[in-house]
Amino acid sequence: MNILFTSAGRRTYIIHYFQQALQGNGKVYASNSIYTYTLSQADGYTISPEIYNPNYIPFLIEYCKKQQITAIIPLFDIDLPVLAKNYDQFAQEGITLVVSDYPVTQICNDKWATYQFLLKAGLTPPPTFLTLPDTINALNTDSITFPLIVKPRWGMGSIGIYSVNNLEELNILYSKLKHDIWNTALRFESAADKEECIIIQQHIEGQEYGIEILNDLDCNYTATFSKKKIAMRSGETDIAETVDPTPFIPIAQTISSNLRHRAMLDVDCFISPSGQIIVLEMNCRFGGQYPFTHNAGVNVPRQLIQWLSGGETNHSLLTQQCGIRSCKEINPVIF
């Protein structure tokens, strides 16, 4: 079995995990910028057209056929809806996209849609607003209080996130962010609604946790992994310690059954001082949390390979040890 990772970025560890899981019975390929070290760690790589280029999908299909690649796993939020729209086209060529259905990618990438989904599922997200007038009305009625968080509606990697402490900061940073979005990769998805491309949320006090919800390839709930976040870097978990997932399982099962995502779902949440679990964001892909789960004895790559090969769920691969603290090391390399 040969597997391709699109937009592999800095996730060299994912390449290594899958190489180890294949146990010599296949190769791992990657695509991204030529300046990405991860490419040098894969068994092969390609430089594809940009994701919104009309030649992107035909290029990937031809590359997969040439290299006998039978599964693609995207690692970047922008890739997800583009690939999901073409799921059937890949399937006709015998290539499995390990990606959620298109509506799921829209719910996860659009933080306003995430908020609405969580409310409908009976869960507790932070109070969230789409316009300045609605936010100011909520402030005037004491429904929310400063500090607030202003961030892109279609955001990723902590790009353009601001904490505001008063009305003056809110107005200034809202305007600044609305301008800045168009100078980043966020402009592509934000073009879906240029006037309402920012959300404003109540700042949440409490301890931040990360949970990963694993569904099988038929979108059925399989497992939950959890960790306490100790430090962050560039929007990714940098230091974390695995914790007992039991308190998070009811929420994970609710999300799984309502969302029906495929494979991994990366979820950020807080436990408030009163003990309430507040769900913040979701990403329907391998996220920056996964190395901490892997270090705690879980082997999702091996399980995915078994599923892709027609095998059953092996719960011994999905049993997380608690109390395992890990960090991500920065190690300069020549490539």
Give the location of each predicted region.
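Conserved ATP-binding module of the ATP-grasp superfamily
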Residues: 124-125, 167-204
